[in-house]
Amino acid sequence: MELESTSNGRRPPPPAEIGRGAYLAWEDLTVVIPNFSGGPTRRLLDGLNGHAEPGRIMAIMGPSGSGKSTLLDSLAGRLARNVIMTGNLLLNGKKARLDYGLVAYVTQEDILMGTLTVRETITYSAHLRLSSDLTKEEVNDIVEGTIIELGLQDCADRVIGNWHSRGVSGGERKRVSVALEILTRPQILFLDEPTSGLDSASAFFVIQALRNIARDGGRTVVSSIHQPSSEVFALFDDLFLLSSGETVYFGESKFAVEFFAEAGFPCPKKRNPSDHFLRCINSDFDTVTATLKGSQRIRETPATSDPLMNLATSEIKARLVENYRRSVYAKSAKSRIRELASIEGHHGMEVRKGSEATWFKQLRTLTKRSFVNMCRDIGYYWSRIVIYIVVSFCVGTIFYDVGHSYTSILARVSCGGFITGFMTFMSIGGFPSFIEEMKVFYKERLSGYYGVSVYIISNYVSSFPFLVAIALITGSITYNMVKFRPGVSHWAFFCLNIFFSVSVIESLMMVVASLVPNFLMGLITGAGIIGIIMMTSGFFRLLPDLPKVFWRYPISFMSYGSWAIQGAYKNDFLGLEFDPMFAGEPKMTGEQVINKIFGVQVTHSKWWDLSAIVLILVCYRILFFIVLKLKERAEPALKAIQAKRTMKSLKKRPSFKKVPSLSSLSSRRHQPLHSLSSQEGLTSPIN
C-alpha cells in the first residue's frame, strides 16, 4: 500500500527555500561495470534519486558492498574510467563538472606527514593552495580560523606522530584531514567514512565538527558512514540508506524510524536506529545465524510475530525498497529535485579553478616542508649518516695508509669498488621514508594541490644538503685514512663521485617506490636492480670480459657503477707509480695498472665518467616524472582489474545477491529463520 503520510498523520516538512550555496541533485543515477568479455554487466547503483543542500549534513549508510563508496565517488567525480555512469548530476540546476576548488574530498585514510605539527601541516597546505596575492598575515589568519573551526587549538603545536614519536589522537588526525580540505572554502565537502577506527567519543566530535562546518559555513556536507552510534546518528540531517545499489530510504534522518515502522519493521526502544536499519538490510546476518545454528545445534524457536525472525533479510530488504518507491518520501525527493533543476545561476557560489598559488611559491613551500620532514625523521637521513660514518671509519682502518706496494694495487681497487658500490647501496635504507612521502604526494596530487614537476624538483632540492653531507663525510674520512692520491682536486672528484652515485641510487629508489608502493616488495625490487648494476660495474668481472650481447652493450653503459668505478680508478691511479711484482723490474704506472690489469680505457678523462653519472641521474629523474604521469593515465585500467576482483568477492556475499521481488514474499514468508537479537535488542535467542 502506498505510504501517503507518517503514522501520526504528519508528512515530511516542505523543502526549504532555495538560497545561496551549492545545491547538488542526482536523478536516475546508475553506475555499471560493463563486462567486455561477454558476461553480464554488473550494476553497482540502480536509478538513485536524491539531493544534498547547503547547511545540512547527509549520511550515506548501508552494509558492506551496498554502494556507499560508489555513490560518494559518483557525486564527487572520482569514479574510475572503467565504469559507466548514467543519469543526471546537477549543481544548482546545471550539469557541471565538480572541479577542485568547488568540492573537497576527505579520504578514509589520514595521510599526513607525522613529523609536522598540526599548525605546520595546515600552514604548508595553505601556502600550497591559497592565492599568492595573499600576505603571510592573511594566510596565517585563515590557518588560525580553520584551527578554531575544527577545535584543534589544544593540539595545534603537537606533532601528528609517526613510528618514532607519539602524536595526536585518531579523532584529532581526522579533524586535521578535514581542516586541510576546507582551507580553500569549498562549497561541497565529501567524506569517506570519517569515523572509521575511532571510538564513540572521537567519532562524535568529528561529526559534530562537520555539522558546524555545514551550518556555520553554509556548506553542503555528504559523508559515507558504516554504523554510527545513536548520538552520532542524531547529528545527521539527512539519510541515504543503500542496499545492493538500491535506495532503501532517502529523507530526513529523524523520519527514518517512522518509515521502517510503517513498513512493518519498527525499531525497538532500546536499540540504536542505525543498528536496526542495517540489521534489516544486511543479509550477512542470515549466514551468521545459520552458521551458529548448525554449529551449536540450536532447536527451533517458537513462532513469533517479530518480522525479523519470520522473514529472510533479503525479503525484508525487498519490501523496504518497494515501500520506499511508493512512499511520500520518494515523491518528496523527486519534487525537490525538480525544484533544484530550475535554479538559474550559481547563487553567489564562488568557484576556484585549481590551486591559486604560483609554481615558484609551490616549489618553495614544498622544498621547505620536505626539508623540515627530512630533518625531523631520523629514519630518512640521520640514521644513514650515522651508519656512513661508522662504515667509513671501518674502511679507513682496514685500508689504512694503503701505500704504493704491488699488493696495494688490489687493496686500492677493492676499497674503491666497495665505496662506489656497496656504500652507495646503503641509500636503499631511505626507501620506507620514500614510500610515506609518495603516499602524501598521491593524496595531494589527486586533490589538485600541485603538479608532478614541482614535487620532483622540490624533493631533490630538499635532499641536496643531506646528500652533500654524506659525500663529504664519507669522502673526507676514507680519503684521508686510506691515503688515496693526494691533492684537493682529487679529493673533490672523489666526493663528487660519491655524491652523484648516491643521488642516482636515491632517484632509482624513487622510481621503484612509484612503481612498487609496497615496503617489502619495493626493497626486494630495488635491491635486485642495484645488484644487477653492481654485477656489471666491472668490479666482479672486468668490463672487456662481459658478454658483449646485452650485458656489455647496453647494460654496462646504462649502469652508473661502471662509470663510477672507472672514474674512481682514474682519479686514484693516474699519476702514481707502484712497486713491481718482482724486485729489479721497472715500476708500474697507474695507467698501466688500470688499462692492462683492470681493462679500464684511458682514452677519455675521469670527468667524462662523472658526466655520464650525472646524465644517468637526470634520466632517472625524467623516468620518475614519466612514471608518475603514466600512472595517472593507467590508473583506470588498474582500477578495472581491482574492480573485477572485488566483484568476484562480492558475488560470494549474501548481501550482494539480487533481492527477490515483492510478489515472491508470500511463498517464503514463514520460513523458520532466526534473528540475532530479540525485539527489545537486549538478549539473544541463541542460548
UniProtKB/Swiss-Prot annotation:
Location(s), subcellular: Cell membrane; Endoplasmic reticulum
Tissue: Exclusively and constitutively expressed in epidermal cells.
Keyword Metal-binding: no
Biased segments, Polar residues type: 674-687
Residue numbers spanned by region Disordered: 649-687
Superkingdom classification of source: Eukaryota
Keywords noted in UniProt: ATP-binding, Cell membrane, Endoplasmic reticulum, Lipid transport, Membrane, Nucleotide-binding, Phosphoprotein, Plant defense, Transmembrane, Transmembrane helix, Transport
Record's function text: Involved in the secretion of cuticular wax from epidermal cells to the cuticle, especially in the transport of aldehydes, alcohols and acids. (Microbial infection) Required for the polarization of reflected light on both adaxial and abaxial leaves surfaces upon viral infection by Turnip vein clearing virus (TVCV), probably by regulating cuticular wax compounds deposition, thus influencing visual attractiveness of infected plants for insect vectors.
PANTHER family from the UniProt entry: ABC TRANSPORTER G FAMILY MEMBER 11, ABC TRANSPORTER G FAMILY MEMBER 12
Descriptive protein name: ABC transporter G family member 12
Taxonomic source organism: Arabidopsis thaliana (Mouse-ear cress)
